[in-house]
Regions:
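Short glycine-enriched, charge-decorated loop/helix-capping segments at active-site entrances
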Residues: 19-28, 62-64, 101-105
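Short, basic/glycine-rich phosphate-binding loops at helix/coil junctions
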Residues: 14-17, 91-100
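Short beta-strand segments at enzyme active-site cores
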Residues: 46-52, 85-90, 152
Length: 201
């Protein structure tokens, strides 16, 4: 049976958006992210980061630096009881990329490539899954992939997005939605979701 995932954009959802984050000393986790992820894990969601990384394409930092930062962030999350199942990133940009990084790619949101990779590689049901983003491109990717629910965390995107989504001001609102949704599902089915034991990232 396929599992469900909580897809998280990184910059602006997991960490505070500062623009092309690549240094440990610049990382500030978004308020509520640890509690949200722990609750999602308890409700049976796999935790998957899906992030556009145009900073790699532009030459601001390389893939090794990105992976090193993600390893450190993974350790910080783990210290708070949070285990990531996977991190998918797109290092390409169709206009501002340098060399081989200047190209269109289905992984770059609003493309659905990263979501579909997770579906295949992690056996995730997209129609049972949820995405949290802070930009319209996140919402478009979620809608195109047929995700059950998309959330837009207010603060980064300056205009209203098209498509189906719920806009929230804090991650705590999404945590409460997940809890209510789980209660409704359990009431309908009479079954209780089990906790997933994700592998360490």
């Amino acid at each position: 049976m396929s599992s469900k995932a909580l897809f998280l954009d990184r910059d602006g959802v997991v960490n505070v958006e500062i623009g092309y984050l690549h240094r440990i000393e610049e990382v500030e986790f978004v308020s509520g992210i640890f509690s949200l992820c722990r609750t999602a894990m308890r409700l049976g969601y796999r935790l998957v980061i899906v992030t556009n990384q145009a900073g790699i394409a532009r030459g601001y930092y390389d893939e090794a630096a990105f992976n090193a930062l993600m390893a450190w962030m993974g350790e910080q999350l783990r210290s708070q009881g949070v285990e990531l199942d996977a991190v998918y990133y797109c290092p390409y940009h169709p206009e501002h990329g340098i060399g081989d990084y200047k190209r269109e790619h289905e992984d770059r949101k609003p493309g659905t490539g990263m979501l579909r990779r997770a579906m295949k590689e992690l056996d995730v049901s997209l129609t049972q899954s949820v995405l949290i983003g802070d930009r319209c491109s996140d919402i478009a990717a979620a809608n195109s992939a047929g995700l059950r629910q998309a959330f837009l965390l207010a603060g980064t995107e300056g205009s209203e997005c098209s498509g189906n989504y719920l806009e929230v001001n804090a991650l705590e609102e999404i945590e409460q939605w997940l809890l209510r949704d789980s209660s409704e599902v359990e009431s309908d089915s009479g079954e209780v979701s089990g906790k997933v034991s994700p592998e360490s990232f």
